[in-house]
Amino acid sequence: MKAIILAGGQSERFGAPKAFAEIDGKMFYEQIITVLDSMNMFNEIIISSNETLASEFKGARVIVDDSEHKNKGPLSGIYSVMKQDFESELFFVISVDTPLITAKAISQLYQFMVEHVIEDQLDIAGFKEGNHPIPTIAFYSPNCLPIIARALESDDYSMRHVYQQTASDWIDVSSVDDDTEWYKNINYPQDLESIKK
Protein backbone atom coordinates (compact mmCIF):
# COMPACT_ATOMS: atom_id res chain seq x y z
CA MET A 1 0.00 0.00 0.00
CA LYS A 2 1.27 3.45 -0.89
CA ALA A 3 0.68 6.90 0.54
CA ILE A 4 0.38 10.01 -1.61
CA ILE A 5 1.05 13.42 -0.10
CA LEU A 6 -0.57 16.04 -2.32
CA ALA A 7 1.82 18.99 -2.37
CA GLY A 8 1.46 20.60 -5.77
CA GLY A 9 -0.97 23.42 -5.03
CA GLN A 10 -0.26 27.08 -5.64
CA SER A 11 -0.86 28.02 -1.95
CA GLU A 12 -2.15 31.43 -3.06
CA ARG A 13 -4.21 31.99 0.10
CA PHE A 14 -1.30 31.01 2.32
CA GLY A 15 1.19 33.22 0.48
CA ALA A 16 3.98 30.61 0.22
CA PRO A 17 4.18 26.86 -0.49
CA LYS A 18 2.43 25.22 2.46
CA ALA A 19 4.55 22.08 2.23
CA PHE A 20 7.49 24.02 3.68
CA ALA A 21 5.64 25.88 6.43
CA GLU A 22 6.65 24.63 9.86
CA ILE A 23 4.82 23.28 12.86
CA ASP A 24 6.63 21.95 15.94
CA GLY A 25 9.97 22.43 14.18
CA LYS A 26 9.09 20.32 11.15
CA MET A 27 7.89 21.27 7.72
CA PHE A 28 4.30 20.19 6.99
CA TYR A 29 5.37 17.46 4.57
CA GLU A 30 8.00 16.16 7.02
CA GLN A 31 5.42 16.04 9.79
CA ILE A 32 3.09 13.94 7.63
CA ILE A 33 5.93 11.62 6.56
CA THR A 34 6.84 11.09 10.23
CA VAL A 35 3.27 10.01 11.04
CA LEU A 36 3.02 7.73 7.99
CA ASP A 37 6.43 6.15 8.68
CA SER A 38 5.50 5.47 12.30
CA MET A 39 2.64 3.25 11.19
CA ASN A 40 4.70 0.64 9.31
CA MET A 41 1.72 0.38 7.00
CA PHE A 42 2.96 1.90 3.76
CA ASN A 43 5.62 0.37 1.56
CA GLU A 44 6.22 3.74 -0.06
CA ILE A 45 5.40 7.38 0.59
CA ILE A 46 5.18 9.48 -2.57
CA ILE A 47 4.95 13.24 -2.79
CA SER A 48 2.90 14.56 -5.68
CA SER A 49 4.04 18.04 -6.63
CA ASN A 50 4.76 20.41 -9.49
CA GLU A 51 7.96 21.02 -11.44
CA THR A 52 8.79 24.18 -9.51
CA LEU A 53 8.77 22.55 -6.06
CA ALA A 54 9.80 18.97 -6.87
CA SER A 55 13.52 19.35 -6.10
CA GLU A 56 12.84 20.92 -2.68
CA PHE A 57 11.50 17.76 -1.03
CA LYS A 58 13.77 15.40 0.89
CA GLY A 59 13.16 11.89 2.18
CA ALA A 60 10.53 10.68 -0.26
CA ARG A 61 10.04 9.96 -3.93
CA VAL A 62 8.48 12.86 -5.81
CA ILE A 63 6.23 12.46 -8.84
CA VAL A 64 5.55 15.60 -10.84
CA ASP A 65 2.02 16.17 -12.09
CA ASP A 66 1.39 14.79 -15.57
CA SER A 67 2.15 17.52 -18.12
CA GLU A 68 -1.21 17.21 -19.89
CA HIS A 69 -3.09 17.65 -16.61
CA LYS A 70 -0.95 20.06 -14.62
CA ASN A 71 -2.72 22.85 -12.73
CA LYS A 72 -5.88 20.77 -12.44
CA GLY A 73 -5.82 20.43 -8.67
CA PRO A 74 -5.60 17.36 -6.43
CA LEU A 75 -7.00 14.96 -9.04
CA SER A 76 -3.99 15.62 -11.24
CA GLY A 77 -1.66 14.59 -8.43
CA ILE A 78 -3.60 11.43 -7.60
CA TYR A 79 -3.80 10.51 -11.29
CA SER A 80 -0.09 11.08 -11.91
CA VAL A 81 0.93 8.75 -9.07
CA MET A 82 -1.71 6.08 -9.73
CA LYS A 83 -0.80 5.96 -13.41
CA GLN A 84 2.81 5.13 -12.54
CA ASP A 85 2.02 2.77 -9.65
CA PHE A 86 -1.15 1.06 -10.81
CA GLU A 87 -0.11 -2.26 -9.22
CA SER A 88 -0.68 -0.96 -5.69
CA GLU A 89 -3.86 -2.39 -4.20
CA LEU A 90 -4.69 0.78 -2.28
CA PHE A 91 -3.53 4.38 -1.99
CA PHE A 92 -3.85 6.60 1.05
CA VAL A 93 -4.21 10.23 -0.06
CA ILE A 94 -3.44 13.13 2.27
CA SER A 95 -3.16 16.82 1.49
CA VAL A 96 0.04 18.49 2.69
CA ASP A 97 -2.01 21.23 4.34
CA THR A 98 -3.33 18.72 6.90
CA PRO A 99 -0.15 18.42 9.01
CA LEU A 100 -1.93 17.47 12.24
CA ILE A 101 -3.10 14.10 10.88
CA THR A 102 -2.68 11.28 13.40
CA ALA A 103 -1.82 7.61 13.10
CA LYS A 104 -4.98 6.86 15.10
CA ALA A 105 -7.20 8.57 12.51
CA ILE A 106 -5.51 6.82 9.58
CA SER A 107 -5.74 3.42 11.30
CA GLN A 108 -9.42 3.87 12.02
CA LEU A 109 -10.12 4.86 8.42
CA TYR A 110 -8.14 1.87 7.16
CA GLN A 111 -10.20 -0.47 9.36
CA PHE A 112 -13.36 1.07 7.94
CA MET A 113 -12.09 0.57 4.38
CA VAL A 114 -11.11 -3.05 5.01
CA GLU A 115 -14.47 -3.84 6.62
CA HIS A 116 -16.40 -2.43 3.65
CA VAL A 117 -14.20 -2.96 0.60
CA ILE A 118 -15.47 -6.47 -0.22
CA GLU A 119 -19.08 -6.30 0.95
CA ASP A 120 -19.75 -2.80 -0.43
CA GLN A 121 -17.05 -2.90 -3.14
CA LEU A 122 -15.79 0.47 -1.96
CA ASP A 123 -13.40 2.42 -4.16
CA ILE A 124 -13.02 5.41 -1.83
CA ALA A 125 -13.22 5.55 1.96
CA GLY A 126 -12.62 8.89 3.60
CA PHE A 127 -13.52 11.20 6.42
CA LYS A 128 -16.30 13.73 6.49
CA GLU A 129 -17.10 16.65 8.75
CA GLY A 130 -20.85 16.77 9.16
CA ASN A 131 -22.22 16.32 5.65
CA HIS A 132 -19.02 17.43 3.94
CA PRO A 133 -16.68 14.71 2.62
CA ILE A 134 -12.95 15.32 2.98
CA PRO A 135 -11.61 13.55 -0.12
CA THR A 136 -8.05 14.67 0.63
CA ILE A 137 -7.91 12.36 3.67
CA ALA A 138 -9.03 9.11 2.09
CA PHE A 139 -8.12 5.67 0.80
CA TYR A 140 -8.49 5.17 -2.96
CA SER A 141 -8.64 1.97 -4.95
CA PRO A 142 -6.82 1.94 -8.31
CA ASN A 143 -10.29 1.29 -9.80
CA CYS A 144 -10.73 5.06 -9.53
CA LEU A 145 -8.07 5.74 -12.16
CA PRO A 146 -10.31 5.65 -15.27
CA ILE A 147 -12.91 7.85 -13.55
CA ILE A 148 -10.21 10.33 -12.52
CA ALA A 149 -8.87 10.30 -16.09
CA ARG A 150 -12.33 11.10 -17.48
CA ALA A 151 -12.78 13.90 -14.95
CA LEU A 152 -9.44 15.43 -15.94
CA GLU A 153 -10.44 15.29 -19.60
CA SER A 154 -13.69 17.09 -18.82
CA ASP A 155 -14.11 20.66 -17.67
CA ASP A 156 -15.03 19.49 -14.16
CA TYR A 157 -11.96 18.16 -12.37
CA SER A 158 -13.32 18.59 -8.88
CA MET A 159 -12.89 15.80 -6.35
CA ARG A 160 -16.69 15.63 -6.08
CA HIS A 161 -16.88 14.69 -9.76
CA VAL A 162 -14.97 11.50 -8.92
CA TYR A 163 -16.40 10.44 -5.57
CA GLN A 164 -19.98 10.87 -6.78
CA GLN A 165 -19.28 8.41 -9.61
CA THR A 166 -17.59 5.74 -7.51
CA ALA A 167 -18.56 3.51 -4.61
CA SER A 168 -17.53 5.80 -1.77
CA ASP A 169 -18.31 6.04 1.91
CA TRP A 170 -17.28 8.39 4.68
CA ILE A 171 -16.89 8.27 8.44
CA ASP A 172 -17.29 11.37 10.55
CA VAL A 173 -14.20 12.95 12.05
CA SER A 174 -16.01 12.91 15.40
CA SER A 175 -15.78 9.10 15.44
CA VAL A 176 -12.03 9.38 16.10
CA ASP A 177 -11.35 9.62 19.82
CA ASP A 178 -9.16 12.69 19.57
CA ASP A 179 -10.10 16.19 20.65
CA THR A 180 -7.49 17.93 18.47
CA GLU A 181 -8.35 19.35 15.06
CA TRP A 182 -6.20 16.74 13.29
CA TYR A 183 -8.32 16.96 10.12
CA LYS A 184 -8.20 20.73 9.65
CA ASN A 185 -6.70 22.32 6.55
CA ILE A 186 -4.21 25.11 7.04
CA ASN A 187 -5.28 27.56 4.34
CA TYR A 188 -4.17 30.91 5.73
CA PRO A 189 -1.24 32.06 7.88
CA GLN A 190 -3.70 32.85 10.68
CA ASP A 191 -4.85 29.19 10.64
CA LEU A 192 -1.30 28.16 11.42
CA GLU A 193 -0.92 30.80 14.11
CA SER A 194 -4.13 29.65 15.84
CA ILE A 195 -2.82 26.07 15.97
CA LYS A 196 0.52 27.14 17.41
CA LYS A 197 -1.17 28.91 20.33
UniProtKB/Swiss-Prot annotation:
BP-aspect Gene Ontology terms: Mo-molybdopterin cofactor biosynthetic process
Binding positions (Mg(2+)): D97
EC number of the protein: 2.7.7.77
GO terms for MF: GTP binding; metal ion binding; molybdenum cofactor guanylyltransferase activity
GO terms under cellular component: cytoplasm
Binding site for GTP: L6, A7, G8, K18, D65, D97
Keywords: Cytoplasm, GTP-binding, Magnesium, Metal-binding, Molybdenum cofactor biosynthesis, Nucleotide-binding, Transferase
Job of this protein: Transfers a GMP moiety from GTP to Mo-molybdopterin (Mo-MPT) cofactor (Moco or molybdenum cofactor) to form Mo-molybdopterin guanine dinucleotide (Mo-MGD) cofactor.
Protein name: Probable molybdenum cofactor guanylyltransferase
